[in-house]
Amino acid sequence: QFIGFPLFEDRLRLFEIYESELIEWNTRFNLTAIKNPDEIRTKHFLDSLSCALAINDFNGRSLVDVGTGAGFPGIPLKIIFPDLKLTLVDSVGKKLVFCQHIIDRLSLTDCRIIHARAEDLGKDPLHRERYDIAVARAVTGLSALSELLLPLVKRKGIMIAQKGETAAEELKAAEKAIRILGG
């Protein structure tokens, strides 16, 4: 069980496959600096799933994961919430090739991959104010991140910025940008 969500055997198996594929692909492509299985589980999988602390049910909602890299946090959330409508965005093609491979390998449905820069996505009418949730981790500072994510969420939508120890300082520095953008 994780944060009140049951982790059934089939879901755990998907995480095992994801971990194995990530380790294998990382030998050929620089997908992540984290290579140790224990660190992959804590720093990638569990950190990704910590988004569930902000929203207890992602099922049926649309989520855009900006700067997804090797699929974090979007794919772990999709594994736990199979009815999540997932869009993964990154500007690095090889990372998206890996994400598509994982989506296919895990037989995940209702997933979309977009090769684009976040700055351009928010200006595109096909993506502006289209998502229930916009999420990013380790992409940029909170002020700039607000400018990238907030244009993507619908009115009353949710922006999740996974930040580390400097979160409080970044939030204070980003208050003006968040207010201007309607967050």
PLM features: residue spans?
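Short loop or secondary-structure boundary microenvironments that flank
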Residues: 38, 135-139, 164
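Conserved residues at beta->alpha junctions
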Residues: 9, 90, 162-165
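Residue-level signal for inorganic ion chemistry
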Residues: 22, 77, 163
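Class I SAM-dependent transferase core
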Residues: 2-60, 64, 94, 100-111
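Helical mechanochemical/support elements of P-loop NTPase systems and associated helical scaffolds
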Residues: 41, 91, 95, 166-170
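Short "lid" loop at the C-terminus of a central beta-strand within the Rossmann-like core
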Residues: 119, 141, 164-168
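Conserved SAM/SAH cofactor-binding pocket of Class I
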Residues: 49-138, 146-147
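C-terminal substrate-binding/active-site "lid" region of AdoMet-derived donor-dependent transferases
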Residues: 134, 148-183
